[in-house]
Amino acid sequence: MGKDYTFIRNWISFHFMGNINNFSYCVVNAASGNLSAYFHNSKNIGIILWANIAFGLVSRLVNTFLIENVNSKLKIVVNCLFMSIGLIGVALSVYVNFGFCIAAIAFVGIASSFGESVILSYMKKFPAELVNGWSSGTGIAGVCGSLFYIAMVAAGLSNSTIFYMMLPTVAVYFLLFFFGLKVPNHLEEDRTDNHNNSNNSSNNSKYTEKQSLVKKDQLIEDIDDGGGAEVAPPGETKKQRYIRCARLVWFNAVNLALVYFFEYVASVGGADLALKKDPNNDNFFIANAFAIFSFCYQLGVLISRSSLQFVKIKHIGVITILQGINMVFWIIQAKYKMVTSVWVLFILMVYCGLLGGASYVNVFYLILHQKNIPNEDRELCINYAALLVTVGITLAACFILVMDHTFLASEVPKTDSSSST
């Protein structure tokens, strides 16, 4: 079926917003090796990942439970402010200390997590297929971010200059949301951003209205989910609604969290120690292996996040099992260095990204698509899944810190070389 101008316009806008939303976050991850080495904290590389995601968990909680009814436009303005503070802070941190750098990275992480939570919730106003535009944008952000950092370092630019150069992306993000996106007319009437969910002690008439909303949703195809929408009963309290929605998405959301835990342990904790550190080796690919691992991982994410138009995976649990096995391999590799070819490791990191991206795009597609989730509850269900993504990455950061200070401590370089400032 051909897509009209509005659909294409929105797809492009969501794509580039997804790219920008995760761009700074991905650059920080690619730079984490150099940043931790510059501050003589290679053993604490996990703290950078933790700062980049942990405070994002708080922002997701706030967006889900405290400011659910706040206008999305205001949220985006605030998010642009967070982006700017984070980038400027990281750029200035090389003149201060590691703690200041961590605080600035926290703002970068907040902007990425909060922005994702806001935009995914906002997408309930649009056809479910547009999640592919957003997901492919977030996927390409990793490729662009890691390539950008590798190229800038190769060009001899300092970390300060690199992060200052990223500031114009914030303005583009702002313009795309306010002037690029256009809510389809046939959805605008039924799905307003100011919809007030606070009065959950609804009467029978509202119960009937909810049933009708589910029945008239023409945007999505049927998925064999074993039944129709679980419409909220009359008199449902806010707490009861939270519990009911959690039950609707718990399986897919928990699988997504596990996949993210496994892949971040592999792509950060495992990849950082996957090769023997030799200061006398001037091979570009080995010297910059961690940043290149980040690129390979993000390349895999991009490919799989852009695959929704071609293949849809309903059995999410299979991806979780494969990623768990993959994580075990990378931990063993970090300890024993079994695979000596950096090129084989690069390919295996692409595979890691493929699994992660596939889980992400298919879980959110299912949430936006499944008939058993009422339209008015999709935003909350999306926020639950996004929240558990952050939980998975936060736990991964903590696990990496434990690994680097315990059974992998002997593999961490004892001396740190300064990177460019």
Curated annotation (Swiss-Prot):
Topology with respect to the bilayer: Multi-pass membrane protein
UniProt keyword terms in alphabetical order: Glycoprotein, Lysosome, Membrane, Transmembrane, Transmembrane helix
Entry keyword annotation includes Transmembrane: yes
Record localization: Lysosome membrane
Transmembrane segments: 13-35, 47-67, 74-96, 101-123, 137-157, 161-181, 248-268, 284-304, 313-333, 338-358, 382-402
Gene3D superfamilies associated with the record: MFS general substrate transporter like domains
Record keyword Transmembrane helix present: yes
Low complexity composition-biased segments: 195-205
SUPFAM superfamilies (UniProt xref): MFS general substrate transporter (SSF103473)
Origin superkingdom: Eukaryota
Family: Belongs to the battenin family.
UniProt name for this protein: Battenin
Species assigned in the record: Dictyostelium discoideum (Social amoeba)
